[in-house]
């Protein structure tokens, strides 16, 4: 019994450590204006980038063969755009290739493995926030996969829920101003 309690305590300590490590020790590569790695790193969310320096983020659009897109709703505790709709995405970790980052983010946030999905990289756009230290490239991917409700396992720290929407429904949501990045990525939703 004592050993079991000790193992349980160790398990919870490791879980707490992993959450802390992922939050506070995650590192990102710094890129130049040509999207080349500089060889330097930054801590996650340490917005100290100089003008001309960027980090890399990825977005993974999932479309079913019936033409519907998977979108998720951001949790209300997000500091930026709480409750807004979005597609899966996030930052590439140091040393991680863009394709690996998008596969990881989609799997973490939705439980869906897009490794065997049709599609892939579509385009990149650049977002600059002069003087704020948060400049980034966004690699946008589109995957076509037959996803069913039972395939989805939402990461509750990130999303309130999800839904599948048509192009028209997506445009209606975007018209409310509550779809993250829509103006930058709307071309990926077209045929």
Model-identified regions with their sequence ranges:
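Nudix hydrolase/Nudix homology domain
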Residues: 21-23, 78, 82-83, 94, ...
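Acidic, metal-coordinating catalytic segment for phosphate/diphosphate chemistry
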Residues: 24-59, 65
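A glycine-rich, hydrophobic loop/mini-helix early in the fold
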Residues: 57-89
């Amino acid at each position: 019994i004592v050993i079991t309690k000790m193992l349980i305590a160790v398990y919870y300590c490791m879980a707490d450590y992993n959450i802390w490590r992922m939050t506070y020790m995650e590192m990102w590569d710094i890129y130049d204006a040509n999207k080349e790695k500089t060889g330097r790193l930054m801590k996650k969310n340490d917005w100290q980038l100089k003008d001309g320096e960027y980090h890399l983020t990825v977005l993974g659009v999932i479309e079913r063969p019936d033409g519907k897109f998977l979108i998720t709703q951001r949790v209300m505790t997000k500091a930026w755009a709480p409750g807004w709709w979005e597609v899966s995405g996030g930052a590439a970790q140091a040393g991680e290739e863009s394709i690996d980052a998008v596969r990881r983010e989609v799997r973490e946030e939705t439980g869906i493995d897009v490794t065997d999905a049709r599609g892939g990289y579509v385009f990149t756009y650049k977002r600059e926030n002069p003087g704020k230290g948060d400049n980034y490239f966004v690699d946008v991917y589109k995957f076509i996969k037959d996803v069913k409700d039972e395939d989805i396992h939402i990461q509750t720290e990130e999303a309130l829920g999800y839904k599948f929407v048509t192009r028209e429904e997506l445009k209606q949501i975007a018209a409310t101003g509550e779809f993250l990045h829509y103006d930058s990525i709307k071309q990926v939703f077209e045929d």
